[in-house]
């Protein structure tokens, strides 16, 4: 069971969020043992926890999203189930790697992608990708779910089943405020 916390945001508004620590523990229970990715403030709590290196999993930072896809492929071929952490703005960088490597050769990975620019609320450079990221995933034939505290267990089960049965990447889209952020 993923544990939640109440965090204060803005002017005393309480928003429930998953703890990064409990979510990583849950992924490790599901046998995800290799993590890589490119930093994003919405995923900063996850990255902070992974950098602590107290886990029975390995975290290797990546310089670009397409390079992270390559690291995930290597980890999978070496026998480890990989997780890629990235901002949705990096989807354009890594689509070619996914379509010419993972999708053709059936190499799975769990992708945790932040949803910057959702509903036009973010810095201007994130708004276009925030509007089209899900359509890009669909067009590429990559399944996804929008992760929430309420559907976490169900979505993790679905992702694991798709990854194991179909040997394809599966994306969890993460909205701002779902995980604790650290700066």
Feature locations, PLM:
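Thiamine diphosphate
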Residues: 2-183
């Amino acid at each position: 069971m993923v544990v939640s916390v109440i965090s204060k945001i803005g002017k005393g508004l309480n928003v429930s969020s998953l703890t990064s620590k409990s979510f990583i523990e849950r992924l490790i229970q599901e046998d995800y043992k290799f993590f890589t990715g490119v930093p994003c403030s919405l995923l900063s709590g996850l990255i902070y926890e992974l950098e602590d290196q107290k886990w029975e999993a390995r975290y290797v930072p990546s310089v670009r999203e397409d390079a992270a896809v390559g690291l995930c492929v290597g980890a999978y071929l070496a026998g480890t189930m990989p997780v890629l952490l990235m901002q949705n703005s990096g989807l354009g960088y890594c689509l070619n790697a996914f379509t010419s490597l993972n999708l053709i050769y059936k190499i799975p990975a769990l992708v945790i992608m932040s949803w910057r620019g959702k509903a036009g609320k973010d810095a201007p450079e994130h708004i276009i990708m925030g509007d089209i990221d899900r359509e890009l995933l669909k067009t590429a034939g990559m399944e996804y779910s929008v992760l929430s505290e309420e559907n976490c267990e169900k979505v993790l089960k679905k992702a694991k089943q798709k990854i194991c049965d179909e040997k394809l990447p599966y994306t969890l889209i993460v909205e701002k405020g779902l995980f604790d952020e650290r700066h």
